[in-house]
A protein has these predicted regions:
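N-terminal FAD cofactor-binding segment of flavoenzymes
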Residues: 45-84
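N-terminal Rossmann-like FAD-binding beta1-loop-alpha1 element of flavoenzymes
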Residues: 5-32
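Long, low-complexity, intrinsically disordered polar/charged segments
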Residues: 1-9, 32-34, 40, 141-142
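Short glycine-rich hinge loops at helix-strand junctions in the catalytic core
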Residues: 27, 65, 124
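Glycine-rich FAD pyrophosphate-binding loop
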Residues: 24-49
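Conserved N-terminal helical subregion
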Residues: 73-149
Length: 149
């Protein structure tokens, strides 16, 4: 395939997909390549972890159109306490009443589902997965990758 796009993004995880969506909002096309199978990454029970999404990252998710899909699945971070193992003392972070929250918590699976759904609907994103990158080349004129499919 010799389809030219504005961006080549190697890695379609939370960051890569968010980058592709943000770029698409600005009119940039991308090839988004990942070796993992999207079906397994979004399967029930694959990843029980959750991520703390900062206020700035939440604004980015809202900007790329994920708010409506994600909002019912998250919860506000009202305060953060930082402890250093068994040492005495701790740091407490609490926003002022006019500042809102410190961010939101989401299950990683929910983040992936929302990102995959949004990327699938975006014509400026060409999604390639699961596929291995066999080689890549960077030059003063651009970048290219040879995929294993």
């Amino acid at each position: 395939m010799t389809d030219k796009r504005d961006l080549l993004i190697l890695g379609g995880g939370l960051v890569g997909m968010t980058l592709a969506l943000a770029a698409a909002k600005k009119g940039l096309s991308s090839h988004l390549v990942d070796r993992a199978d999207p079906a397994s990454l979004t399967a029930d029970g694959f990843d029980g972890r959750a991520s703390a999404i900062s206020t700035a990252s939440w604004r980015l998710f809202r900007h790329v159109g994920l708010e409506e899909t994600l909002e019912p699945h998250g919860c506000d971070i009202a305060a953060i306490a930082v402890l250093d193992q068994m040492k005495r003392g701790r740091l407490d972070f609490r926003p002022e009443p006019h500042e809102g929250t410190l961010g939101r918590m989401f299950a990683n699976r929910q983040l992936r589902l929302a990102l995959h759904e949004a990327a699938a609907k975006e014509p400026l994103i060409s999604w390639h997965a699961p596929v291995e990158v066999m080689s890549r080349d960077r030059s003063e004129f651009g970048v290219s990758a040879t995929l294993g499919d």
